[in-house]
């Protein structure tokens, strides 16, 4: 059953974001999504300094970055969050998720950097992953175009961005085994209603296939735009680029502290739970949290929904608690 405030959020969303949006062209989807995001984005919270910059990737393209830095620095809350936005790898921008990134910075006192990675279908797999990995490596090496970013680093993201945070962490772990820069310096990862596998996990894949705001058909449409036709008949053996589907990994050990959040009415709900179970089975530290009565993309209802306010508080508490732990 939907929380009452979430039902109102869904009703308002339906007036802005047509149910068939995932079937439209990427350009049409982005125009609709940008209008939708703007309708739910409040003014910036007080006490933040915002700075835009760009990072030049190894292939020569620019990756947009936006830093939210609390004006009143608190040495007891020193750290930087790299945030990877959601949007099915197809939509989303620095602006679209400001309701999340600005509030995370304001409510934790941490620096938060939003990452404007390349989008599909113009840039298919593994472009988004590669951009986020490059930015993370640059952050760890002190090469981002911002002054005095506090360590340590945390990774976070929602939906597709949750996939990217998990895949970057796995890639860094595996790099560390061959003598290159690894996970040292990354204290934790927070995944909010993430997409972590080629197929959403059961039972939500079946019970929530027609959930509000994200259906199973939507998941498959986004999957095809980013990963291509690898799961179509006749293409089942096409290779999946390493790390881009975290639930397909061979290993779940060696990861930093992990929070994975699922929401009740979402075909992706059980991806978070299964990821946590596999990390725990491998001896790692991970916790799951379930948002009852909530839907995919509900963070935009932060101002009205008690359940979303609890979700947001859970993420903030995890980030701060993780930073307080000894190395």
Predicted region positions:
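Gly/Ala-rich beta-loop-alpha elbow adjacent to hydrolase catalytic centers
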Residues: 157, 161, 165
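Alpha/beta-hydrolase active-site loop signature
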Residues: 88, 117-121, 196, 295
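Catalytic nucleophile-loop/oxyanion-hole region of alpha/beta-hydrolase
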Residues: 93-94, 100, 113-152, 302-308
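A glycine/proline-hinged amphipathic helix-loop "lid/cap" segment
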Residues: 1-67, 232-236, 323-327
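Alpha/beta hydrolase fold serine-hydrolase catalytic domain that processes acyl esters and thioesters
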Residues: 151, 167-327
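Short beta-strand element of the alpha/beta-hydrolase
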Residues: 77-86
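Short beta-strand-to-loop junctions in surface cap/lid or active-site-entrance loops
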Residues: 65-77, 247-252
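Active-site glycine-rich loops that stabilize anionic/oxyanionic intermediates
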Residues: 85-90, 265
């Amino acid at each position: 059953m939907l929380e009452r405030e979430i039902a109102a959020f869904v009703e308002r969303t339906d007036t802005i974001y047509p149910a068939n949006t995932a079937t439209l062209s990427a350009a049409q989807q982005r125009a609709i999504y940008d209008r939708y995001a703007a309708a739910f984005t409040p003014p910036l919270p007080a006490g933040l300094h915002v700075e835009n910059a760009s990072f030049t990737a190894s292939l020569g393209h620019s990756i947009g970055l936006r830093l939210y830095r609390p004006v009143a620095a608190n040495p007891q809350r020193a750290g930087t969050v790299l945030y990877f936005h959601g949007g099915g790898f197809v939509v989303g921008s620095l602006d679209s998720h400001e309701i999340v990134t600005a509030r995370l910075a304001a409510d934790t006192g941490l620096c938060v950097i939003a990452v404007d990675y390349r989008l599909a279908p113009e840039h298919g797999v593994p472009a988004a992953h590669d951009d986020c990995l490059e930015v993370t490596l640059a952050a760890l090496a002190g090469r981002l175009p911002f002054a005095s970013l506090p360590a340590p680093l945390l990774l976070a993201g929602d939906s597709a961005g949750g996939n990217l945070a998990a895949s970057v962490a796995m890639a860094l772990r595996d790099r560390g085994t061959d003598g290159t820069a690894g996970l040292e310096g990354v204290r934790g990862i927070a995944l909010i209603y993430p997409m972590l596998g080629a197929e959403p996990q059961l039972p939500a894949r079946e019970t929530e296939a027609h959930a509000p705001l994200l259906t199973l058909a939507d998941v498959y449409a986004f999957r095809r735009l980013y990963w291509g036709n690898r799961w179509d008949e006749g293409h089942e053996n096409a290779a999946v680029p390493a790390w881009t589907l975290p639930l397909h990994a061979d290993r779940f050990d060696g990861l930093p502290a992990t929070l994975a959040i699922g929401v009740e009415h979402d075909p992706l709900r059980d991806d978070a739970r299964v990821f946590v179970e596999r990390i725990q089975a491998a001896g790692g530290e991970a916790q799951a949290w379930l948002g009852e009565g909530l839907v995919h993309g509900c963070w935009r209802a932060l101002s009205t929904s008690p359940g979303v306010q609890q979700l947001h508080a859970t993420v903030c508490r995890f980030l701060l608690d993780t930073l307080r732990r000894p190395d």
